[in-house]
Amino acid sequence: MQRNGLIGDTIRSLGFLSRLPLPQGWFDNTDDSLPRNARAFPLAGGILGLLAGVALLIANAISLPPLAAALIAIGALAAMTGALHEDGLGDTADGFFGASTPDRRLDIMKDSRIGTFAALTLVIWTSVKASLLMAIIARAGAGYALLALIGTEAASRAGMLAFWHALPSARPGGLADSMGQPQWETVVCGCGLGLALLAIGFLPSGGMVALINALVLMTVVLFGFARLCMAKIGGQTGDTLGAAQQIGSLAALIGLVMAL
Protein backbone atom coordinates (compact mmCIF):
# COMPACT_ATOMS: atom_id res chain seq x y z
CA MET A 1 0.00 0.00 0.00
CA GLN A 2 1.51 3.31 -1.12
CA ARG A 3 0.61 5.53 1.81
CA ASN A 4 2.76 8.51 0.87
CA GLY A 5 1.56 9.13 -2.67
CA LEU A 6 -1.26 11.32 -3.91
CA ILE A 7 -3.85 8.63 -3.18
CA GLY A 8 -2.71 8.43 0.42
CA ASP A 9 -2.73 12.21 0.71
CA THR A 10 -6.26 12.30 -0.67
CA ILE A 11 -7.54 9.74 1.82
CA ARG A 12 -5.88 11.53 4.73
CA SER A 13 -7.28 14.84 3.47
CA LEU A 14 -10.73 13.26 3.43
CA GLY A 15 -10.09 12.09 6.97
CA PHE A 16 -9.45 15.66 8.07
CA LEU A 17 -12.10 17.40 5.96
CA SER A 18 -14.95 14.92 6.37
CA ARG A 19 -16.56 12.30 8.57
CA LEU A 20 -16.56 9.63 5.89
CA PRO A 21 -15.53 6.16 7.14
CA LEU A 22 -12.04 5.48 5.81
CA PRO A 23 -9.58 2.57 6.13
CA GLN A 24 -7.42 3.08 9.21
CA GLY A 25 -4.41 1.59 7.47
CA TRP A 26 -3.93 4.78 5.47
CA PHE A 27 -3.37 6.71 8.70
CA ASP A 28 -0.96 4.29 10.41
CA ASN A 29 2.82 4.41 10.19
CA THR A 30 3.05 7.60 8.20
CA ASP A 31 5.02 10.72 9.03
CA ASP A 32 3.11 12.97 6.64
CA SER A 33 1.84 16.17 8.20
CA LEU A 34 -1.43 17.82 7.28
CA PRO A 35 0.25 20.79 5.53
CA ARG A 36 1.90 18.31 3.15
CA ASN A 37 -1.22 16.18 2.68
CA ALA A 38 -3.08 19.41 1.95
CA ARG A 39 -1.99 19.29 -1.69
CA ALA A 40 -4.81 16.77 -2.06
CA PHE A 41 -7.48 19.01 -0.48
CA PRO A 42 -8.95 19.76 -3.94
CA LEU A 43 -9.18 16.05 -4.77
CA ALA A 44 -10.91 15.41 -1.45
CA GLY A 45 -13.23 18.31 -2.21
CA GLY A 46 -13.98 16.89 -5.64
CA ILE A 47 -14.97 13.56 -4.08
CA LEU A 48 -17.28 15.31 -1.62
CA GLY A 49 -18.77 17.32 -4.48
CA LEU A 50 -19.31 14.14 -6.48
CA LEU A 51 -21.17 12.47 -3.61
CA ALA A 52 -23.32 15.57 -3.04
CA GLY A 53 -23.98 15.69 -6.78
CA VAL A 54 -25.16 12.08 -6.75
CA ALA A 55 -27.62 13.02 -3.99
CA LEU A 56 -28.83 15.90 -6.18
CA LEU A 57 -29.23 13.58 -9.18
CA ILE A 58 -31.24 11.08 -7.15
CA ALA A 59 -33.50 13.84 -5.84
CA ASN A 60 -34.00 15.12 -9.38
CA ALA A 61 -34.64 11.61 -10.73
CA ILE A 62 -37.52 11.05 -8.30
CA SER A 63 -39.08 14.32 -9.48
CA LEU A 64 -38.35 16.44 -6.44
CA PRO A 65 -38.43 20.16 -7.26
CA PRO A 66 -35.09 21.87 -8.00
CA LEU A 67 -35.11 23.68 -4.65
CA ALA A 68 -35.41 20.40 -2.77
CA ALA A 69 -32.67 18.80 -4.88
CA ALA A 70 -30.36 21.76 -4.27
CA LEU A 71 -30.99 21.75 -0.51
CA ILE A 72 -30.42 17.99 -0.35
CA ALA A 73 -27.04 18.45 -2.04
CA ILE A 74 -26.10 21.25 0.36
CA GLY A 75 -27.27 19.15 3.31
CA ALA A 76 -25.26 16.17 2.07
CA LEU A 77 -22.11 18.29 1.95
CA ALA A 78 -22.71 19.55 5.48
CA ALA A 79 -23.41 16.04 6.75
CA MET A 80 -20.27 14.59 5.16
CA THR A 81 -18.02 17.34 6.54
CA GLY A 82 -19.73 17.71 9.89
CA ALA A 83 -20.49 21.28 8.78
CA LEU A 84 -16.80 22.00 9.36
CA HIS A 85 -16.58 24.89 6.92
CA GLU A 86 -20.05 26.23 7.67
CA ASP A 87 -19.09 26.39 11.34
CA GLY A 88 -16.03 28.41 10.39
CA LEU A 89 -18.12 30.79 8.31
CA GLY A 90 -20.58 31.33 11.13
CA ASP A 91 -17.89 31.82 13.77
CA THR A 92 -16.07 34.27 11.52
CA ALA A 93 -19.22 36.32 10.97
CA ASP A 94 -19.92 36.46 14.70
CA GLY A 95 -16.35 37.40 15.58
CA PHE A 96 -15.70 39.93 12.86
CA PHE A 97 -18.95 41.84 13.25
CA GLY A 98 -19.80 41.22 16.89
CA ALA A 99 -16.78 42.84 18.55
CA SER A 100 -14.53 45.85 18.14
CA THR A 101 -11.06 44.55 19.09
CA PRO A 102 -8.95 41.70 17.65
CA ASP A 103 -8.69 39.84 20.97
CA ARG A 104 -12.42 40.00 21.58
CA ARG A 105 -13.12 38.86 18.02
CA LEU A 106 -10.87 35.84 18.50
CA ASP A 107 -12.60 35.03 21.80
CA ILE A 108 -16.02 35.12 20.14
CA MET A 109 -14.79 32.91 17.31
CA LYS A 110 -13.78 30.25 19.86
CA ASP A 111 -17.26 30.32 21.44
CA SER A 112 -19.34 27.36 20.27
CA ARG A 113 -22.61 29.26 20.62
CA ILE A 114 -24.17 30.69 17.48
CA GLY A 115 -24.86 34.41 17.40
CA THR A 116 -27.06 36.68 15.33
CA PHE A 117 -24.43 37.39 12.68
CA ALA A 118 -23.66 33.69 12.28
CA ALA A 119 -27.31 32.75 11.95
CA LEU A 120 -28.01 35.45 9.37
CA THR A 121 -24.88 34.63 7.39
CA LEU A 122 -25.63 30.91 7.23
CA VAL A 123 -29.27 31.44 6.26
CA ILE A 124 -28.31 33.89 3.51
CA TRP A 125 -25.43 31.69 2.31
CA THR A 126 -27.62 28.57 2.11
CA SER A 127 -30.36 30.47 0.30
CA VAL A 128 -27.99 31.93 -2.27
CA LYS A 129 -26.20 28.63 -2.89
CA ALA A 130 -29.50 26.81 -3.28
CA SER A 131 -30.73 29.42 -5.76
CA LEU A 132 -27.53 29.09 -7.78
CA LEU A 133 -27.81 25.30 -7.94
CA MET A 134 -31.46 25.68 -8.95
CA ALA A 135 -30.41 27.99 -11.77
CA ILE A 136 -27.86 25.46 -13.02
CA ILE A 137 -30.46 22.68 -12.94
CA ALA A 138 -32.96 24.85 -14.81
CA ARG A 139 -30.56 26.24 -17.42
CA ALA A 140 -28.26 23.27 -18.02
CA GLY A 141 -29.62 20.19 -16.26
CA ALA A 142 -29.01 18.16 -13.12
CA GLY A 143 -26.02 16.36 -14.63
CA TYR A 144 -24.23 19.65 -15.13
CA ALA A 145 -25.11 20.62 -11.56
CA LEU A 146 -23.27 17.49 -10.42
CA LEU A 147 -20.22 18.51 -12.46
CA ALA A 148 -20.48 22.02 -11.03
CA LEU A 149 -20.39 20.66 -7.49
CA ILE A 150 -17.27 18.64 -8.26
CA GLY A 151 -15.50 21.68 -9.70
CA THR A 152 -16.70 24.08 -7.04
CA GLU A 153 -15.82 21.92 -4.04
CA ALA A 154 -12.38 21.19 -5.50
CA ALA A 155 -11.50 24.75 -6.50
CA SER A 156 -12.74 26.27 -3.26
CA ARG A 157 -10.41 24.02 -1.28
CA ALA A 158 -7.54 25.02 -3.53
CA GLY A 159 -8.41 28.62 -2.71
CA MET A 160 -8.49 27.73 0.97
CA LEU A 161 -5.03 26.20 0.62
CA ALA A 162 -3.62 29.37 -0.97
CA PHE A 163 -5.32 31.48 1.71
CA TRP A 164 -3.76 29.31 4.45
CA HIS A 165 -0.31 29.71 2.93
CA ALA A 166 -0.56 33.46 2.39
CA LEU A 167 -1.69 34.68 5.81
CA PRO A 168 0.10 34.40 9.16
CA SER A 169 -1.58 32.71 12.09
CA ALA A 170 -3.73 35.10 14.10
CA ARG A 171 -3.94 32.84 17.15
CA PRO A 172 -0.63 31.37 18.37
CA GLY A 173 -1.28 27.92 19.78
CA GLY A 174 -4.57 27.54 17.91
CA LEU A 175 -5.50 24.63 15.65
CA ALA A 176 -4.30 26.25 12.43
CA ASP A 177 -1.10 27.49 14.08
CA SER A 178 -0.26 24.12 15.63
CA MET A 179 -0.49 22.41 12.23
CA GLY A 180 1.91 24.83 10.55
CA GLN A 181 1.41 26.15 7.04
CA PRO A 182 1.68 24.46 3.64
CA GLN A 183 4.79 25.06 1.59
CA TRP A 184 4.68 26.86 -1.75
CA GLU A 185 5.15 23.59 -3.67
CA THR A 186 2.11 22.14 -1.90
CA VAL A 187 0.04 25.18 -2.81
CA VAL A 188 1.09 25.04 -6.48
CA CYS A 189 0.22 21.34 -6.70
CA GLY A 190 -3.10 21.83 -4.95
CA CYS A 191 -4.06 24.80 -7.09
CA GLY A 192 -3.18 22.87 -10.24
CA LEU A 193 -5.45 20.02 -9.17
CA GLY A 194 -8.20 22.45 -8.23
CA LEU A 195 -7.96 24.20 -11.60
CA ALA A 196 -8.14 20.88 -13.45
CA LEU A 197 -11.27 19.80 -11.60
CA LEU A 198 -12.83 23.24 -11.98
CA ALA A 199 -12.31 22.98 -15.74
CA ILE A 200 -13.86 19.51 -15.79
CA GLY A 201 -16.83 20.79 -13.82
CA PHE A 202 -17.47 24.08 -15.61
CA LEU A 203 -16.34 23.79 -19.24
CA PRO A 204 -19.05 21.33 -20.38
CA SER A 205 -21.89 23.66 -19.42
CA GLY A 206 -20.48 27.19 -19.33
CA GLY A 207 -17.40 26.98 -21.52
CA MET A 208 -14.29 29.09 -21.10
CA VAL A 209 -16.34 32.10 -20.01
CA ALA A 210 -17.58 30.22 -16.94
CA LEU A 211 -14.07 29.09 -16.06
CA ILE A 212 -12.64 32.60 -16.35
CA ASN A 213 -15.58 34.09 -14.44
CA ALA A 214 -15.06 31.64 -11.59
CA LEU A 215 -11.30 32.18 -11.39
CA VAL A 216 -11.61 35.96 -11.43
CA LEU A 217 -14.40 36.07 -8.86
CA MET A 218 -12.68 33.60 -6.53
CA THR A 219 -9.41 35.53 -6.72
CA VAL A 220 -11.08 38.87 -6.05
CA VAL A 221 -13.27 37.76 -3.16
CA LEU A 222 -10.56 35.69 -1.46
CA PHE A 223 -8.09 38.56 -1.78
CA GLY A 224 -10.69 40.88 -0.27
CA PHE A 225 -11.43 38.40 2.51
CA ALA A 226 -7.71 38.05 3.24
CA ARG A 227 -7.45 41.83 3.59
CA LEU A 228 -10.46 41.79 5.91
CA CYS A 229 -8.88 39.06 8.06
CA MET A 230 -5.67 41.04 8.39
CA ALA A 231 -7.62 44.14 9.40
CA LYS A 232 -9.91 42.35 11.87
CA ILE A 233 -7.63 39.79 13.57
CA GLY A 234 -4.18 40.10 12.00
CA GLY A 235 -4.14 36.81 10.11
CA GLN A 236 -5.96 33.51 9.70
CA THR A 237 -7.43 30.89 12.02
CA GLY A 238 -9.09 27.55 11.43
CA ASP A 239 -12.44 29.34 11.33
CA THR A 240 -11.33 31.75 8.62
CA LEU A 241 -9.98 28.85 6.57
CA GLY A 242 -13.45 27.32 6.62
CA ALA A 243 -14.98 30.68 5.76
CA ALA A 244 -12.56 31.05 2.84
CA GLN A 245 -13.72 27.71 1.45
CA GLN A 246 -17.36 28.72 1.72
CA ILE A 247 -16.76 32.13 0.15
CA GLY A 248 -14.74 30.62 -2.68
CA SER A 249 -17.40 28.01 -3.46
CA LEU A 250 -20.12 30.63 -3.71
CA ALA A 251 -17.97 32.85 -5.94
CA ALA A 252 -17.28 29.94 -8.29
CA LEU A 253 -20.96 29.06 -8.61
CA ILE A 254 -21.83 32.68 -9.32
CA GLY A 255 -19.22 32.69 -12.09
CA LEU A 256 -20.79 29.62 -13.69
CA VAL A 257 -24.37 30.89 -13.48
CA MET A 258 -23.31 34.20 -15.05
CA ALA A 259 -22.15 32.24 -18.11
CA LEU A 260 -25.22 30.05 -18.57
Curated annotation (Swiss-Prot):
| EC number(s) per entry | 2.7.8.26
Q: What does this protein do?
A: Joins adenosylcobinamide-GDP and alpha-ribazole to generate adenosylcobalamin (Ado-cobalamin). Also synthesizes adenosylcobalamin 5'-phosphate from adenosylcobinamide-GDP and alpha-ribazole 5'-phosphate.
Q: One GO BP annotation here?
A: cobalamin biosynthetic process
What is the protein name stated in its UniProt record?
Answer: Adenosylcobinamide-GDP ribazoletransferase
Provide the gene name from the record.
cobS
- Give the residue spans that cross the bilayer: 42-62, 64-84, 117-137, 144-164, 192-212, 214-234, 240-260
Signal peptide coordinates: none
One Pfam family from the record: CobS
Where is it localised?
A: Cell inner membrane
